[in-house]
């Protein structure tokens, strides 16, 4: 069976976009292997850290990703997105070069092995969340950093995007994310893409149920993505 990786653009446990992804999973799970990318522990990208990760991987392959690292919160950068989810900028990423080197290796391998990627993302300030930008900054780096023209794990990889948010239906976010994905040479399915405007009840109880029309849109995107994967 072909393998699709789901990427959730929010770290919130009960994220609306995680709920949306679970509906999409139910539409595809009988025909595809579905896995979720865990990149919560991925640090902010910088080339010094990249070099230390590469060096540590060359010297040892026994490092492990620490899930228990404490989270430090920044009161100065906290704000909520249009869909009510806390922006990634309000939560410090764990800065553990060797442990995160292991995370990066696992993340890259999962992306390399999959047949396609489906992103589910909220919209933050008319754009995509910083944690997604950081993820794709890492993934767009050459696998061999000594050769800048070397292939990346995402180059040519098929991908599509959906999002649940406010009245804008994540349209601005998806447009800008599509642009980024094309720039890093991914094969982007831009039509159709599902954008969900969350109803009043979702903001009240933290859950939402797709309308028949929204479910139909998601089904159409799922089927077109199946065709797109070939």
Where are these regions (language model features)?
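Short hydrophobic segments within beta-strands
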Residues: 7-9, 37, 162
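A generic structural motif
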Residues: 29-35, 186-187
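N-terminal beta-loop-helix "entrance" segment that forms/cooperates
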Residues: 39-53, 93-97, 202-205
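Short, basic, low-complexity termini and linkers enriched in Ser/Thr/Gly/Pro
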Residues: 51-100
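Helix-loop-strand module that forms the ligand-binding subsite of alpha/beta enzymes
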Residues: 94, 99-184
């Amino acid at each position: 069976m072909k393998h699709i990786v789901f990427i959730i653009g929010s770290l919130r446990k009960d994220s609306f976009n995680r709920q949306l992804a679970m509906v999409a999973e139910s539409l595809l799970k009988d025909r595809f292997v579905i896995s979720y990318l865990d990149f919560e522990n991925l640090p902010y990208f910088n080339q010094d850290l990249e070099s230390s990760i590469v060096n540590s991987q060359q010297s040892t392959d026994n490092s492990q990703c620490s899930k228990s690292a404490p989270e430090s919160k920044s009161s100065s950068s906290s704000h909520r997105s249009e869909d009510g989810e806390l922006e990634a900028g309000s939560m410090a990423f764990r800065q553990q070069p060797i442990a995160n080197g292991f995370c990066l290796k696992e993340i890259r391998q999962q992306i390399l092995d999959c047949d396609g990627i489906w992103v589910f993302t909220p919209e933050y300030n008319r754009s995509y969340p910083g944690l997604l930008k950081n993820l794709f900054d890492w993934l767009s780096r050459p696998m061999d950093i000594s050769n800048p023209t070397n292939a990346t794990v995402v180059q040519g990889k098929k991908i599509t995007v959906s999002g649940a948010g406010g009245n804008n239906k994540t349209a601005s976010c998806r447009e800008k994310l599509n642009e980024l994905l094309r720039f890093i040479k991914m094969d982007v399915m831009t039509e159709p893409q599902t954008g969900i405007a969350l109803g009043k009840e979702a903001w009240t109880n933290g859950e939402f149920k797709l309308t028949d029309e929204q479910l139909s849109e998601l089904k159409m995107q799922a089927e077109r993505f199946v065709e797109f994967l070939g």
